[in-house]
Swiss-Prot record:
InterPro entries listed in its UniProt record: UppP (IPR003824)
Entry protein name: Undecaprenyl-diphosphatase
Organism: Zymomonas mobilis subsp. mobilis (strain ATCC 31821 / ZM4 / CP4)
Membrane topology listed for this record: Multi-pass membrane protein
Family: Belongs to the UppP family.
Length: 267
């Protein structure tokens, strides 16, 4: 696993901060582990499990809303059923495309230089899309038509490329389809739950031989740090998006992408 307590803390914070904002948590972990010299099979297992901490943060943050939706399903609420429909419509395309292409894409593109380029290009795209999106047609997750939910799910598949960002792909896809900023952001949060749970279960099964009881303490620490950090970041992210849009995150991607590209090119 990781030799340094500081490395565990830094990676837990990094996962919690970057999982739900459109800057690519996977890309940041790849770059950070390259910089810290913390990579390998055991490192992959650690990365997978700390993602669960970030997922749990979304469930806790929106617990009351999820509870109301669950009650609405039993009361035959159209709004609740539309919410579930849209989560499934966004989730299923990702599962299908992921099952077909995930390993091939991962083998070809999981490289630090690809991450640097994807961060930069994604930042430029984010600036343009955020600037051009106006007059949204859909202002709640329940109001999103099924065909738009499917298209957002297909956009989410771009996140198989390290550095693209799952949240970035879904949010930008949603903005292009006339979904407002806050709704696009929350829809991305909600889609993360089934998508990341499915990906985590799959990866845990494939990495099961690299998991050891001796690593439980390190994994637990990373999990807790990721959870607490993500819980704080979700609220802050929604406030920033509502007030300032996605430009701050786009510029961050552009700068980090350029810095990473230069670092990798000369090292």
């Amino acid at each position: 696993m990781h030799d340094s307590l500081l490395t565990i803390i830094l990676l837990g914070i990094l996962e919690g901060v970057t999982e739900f904002i459109p800057v690519s948590s996977t890309g940041h972990l790849i770059l950070a582990e390259r910089l810290l010299g913390a990579h390998g099979a055991n490192s992959a297992s650690f990365d997978i499990i700390i993602q669960l901490g970030a997922i749990l943060a979304v469930i806790v943050f929106y617990w009351e809303r999820f509870l109301n939706i669950a009650k609405g399903l039993f009361q035959h609420s159209t709004s609740s059923w539309h919410f579930v429909r849209n989560i499934l419509c966004g989730f299923i395309p990702t599962v299908i495309v992921g099952a077909i292409a995930y390993h091939a894409v991962k083998a070809l593109l999981e490289k630090p230089m690809v991450v640097a380029i994807a961060l930069f290009v994604g930042g430029i795209a984010m600036l343009i899309i955020d600037r051009e999106s106006s007059h949204p047609e859909n202002t709640s997750v329940q109001s999103i038509p099924a065909h738009k939910a499917v298209l957002v799910g297909l956009a989410q598949c771009l996140a198989m490329i390290p550095g693209v960002s799952r949240s970035g792909a879904t949010i930008m896809g949603a903005l292009c389809l006339g979904i407002d900023r806050k709704t696009a952001t929350e829809y991305s949060f909600f889609l993360a739950i089934p998508v990341m749970l499915a990906a985590t279960v799959k990866e845990l099964w494939e990495q099961r031989h690299n998991l050891h009881i001796a690593d439980f303490g390190e994994i637990s620490l990373g999990f807790v740090i990721s959870f607490v950090t993500a819980l704080i970041v979700i609220k802050l992210f929604l406030e920033i998006v509502t007030r300032r849009g996605f430009a701050p995150f786009a510029w961050y991607r552009i700068i980090i992408g350029l810095v990473a590209f230069a670092f990798l090119l000369f090292n």
